[in-house]
Amino acid sequence: SDALFENLHALNDLAHELDKTRLTTMANLSMVENDSPLNHITDVISYNHYFGWYLGKVEDNAPWLDTFHAENPEICLGISEYGCEGIPTLHSASPKVRDYSEEYQAYYHEKMLETFAQRPYLWSTHVWNMFDFASDMRDEGGVQGRNNKGLVTFDRQTRKDSFYIYKAYWTKAPFVHICSRRFKERAEETVQVKVYSNCEQVSLKVNGKKIDSVAGKYVFTFDRVPLTMGENIIQAAGFLGQQEVCCESIPLVRVAEPNASYVLQEEAEKAGQNAKNWFATGDEAGEPLQFPEGYFSIRDKVGALLKNPEGEKLVSELVDQMMPGMKISKGMLNMAKHFTIEKVIEMAGDRIPPEMVRYLNQRLNQIQK
C-alpha cells in the first residue's frame, strides 16, 4: 500500500538522519518480486529464503540469486535468513527434505555454503540459526515448542553435523569431523562415510584397515565402506601435504535390523515434500481443520484456486478485507501461484491469526474443485 511505502521511506530517512555513516537494509520475504520498489528504498537489501525447506529444493537458491543479480546488478544483495530443521536423534542414509534428519540438515548447509562461496556479489548471509530456540506454537519433527533450525542444540551441549561444515570453511586450525556419529546402528553391509575437514586430504580406516584417501575441499565422501557385524571403529585422518595433522575415531555398530527410532514415523510418508506450515494446522481451542476430498483447503496452491471462478472471487474478497487499498500485481500473483495457501499464511506470520486461518479454510471447503 502507499502507506507502507511512505512509512519505509520515512524510516530509511530517519536512520540516515540519526547516523549518516551507516548503511540501511531491509529483509524481504521470498515472494517480494525482483523488480519490486521495496528493493530500492534502503542502501542494501536482503531476502529471507527457505528453498530446500518450506518450498522447492536447496539447489533452487543458486539460480534465484543469479537471476536477481542479473536483473538488478546495481543492488547490493544479501540473504537475511536461511536454514532447515535437524534433530540429532533422527537419521537417514538417504536424507530428504522434511525427514528432519541430522543428515538432511547437514546436506542443506553444505549446498548453501557452496552456493555462497561461488557468489562474491553477496554482501552478507545470515544462517537461521546458531542454536535451537523456544517457539511455543510450533510442533515439528516430533518436538513441541521448539524451532530446531539451530546448528547447536537448545541446551548448547551438542554441535550438530551442520555446525562442522561451517567450521571447515572458517577455521584455520586443522581438524576432521566424521559425520553421522549419532547414526550409530547400521543394518547395511556397506555405508557411506562423510567427513568435514579443512585439510587437503583425508584418509579413512575401518578397524585399522585403510579404505581410501580422498583429496578435496571441505566435504570428503567415502562410498561403500564395509562394516562387519558388531562394533566397527571408523578413523579419519587429515593431511596437509604428506603430513598427518589431525585424526579422530567413532564407533559404528552393524546390526541385523534398522533402528526404527531413527525415523520420525508420522512424517515418514511425507519425506521428500516441503515442510508443512505449523501455523495453519488448527488451534487447540477449536475443531481440527478439515480437508475434504474434491474441495479446496489451505493445502491447495494459490494458482489452482485462481483458476476456479469462485476461488478467484474469494481471493479478491480476502485481499480487500485483509489489505484494504493494496494493489496485487499480476507478477506477484504469478509468483504466489506456486505456493500453497499454507505457505502464504506462514509468510504472513502473526498478521493472520489462527481464527482467520480457520475461517479461510472453512470458506475454501465450500468450493468444489
Which ranges hold each PLM region?
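Compositionally biased low-complexity segments at domain edges in trafficked proteins
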Residues: 263-295, 300
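Compact, charge-rich alpha-helical regulatory domains located at protein termini
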Residues: 286-356
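Edge beta-strands of extracellular beta-sandwich domains
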Residues: 242-256, 264
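Extended substrate-binding grooves/exosites of carbohydrate-active enzymes
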Residues: 1-215, 226, 231-233, 237-243
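Short amphipathic alpha-helical surface patches that mediate protein-protein
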Residues: 130, 319-320, 365
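Short strand-edge motifs at loop-to-beta-strand transitions and within beta-strands
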Residues: 218-223
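Short, charged low-complexity linker/loop segments at the C-terminal edge of domains
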Residues: 171-175, 256-262
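Repeat-associated, polar segments at repeat-unit boundaries in modular proteins
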Residues: 351-369
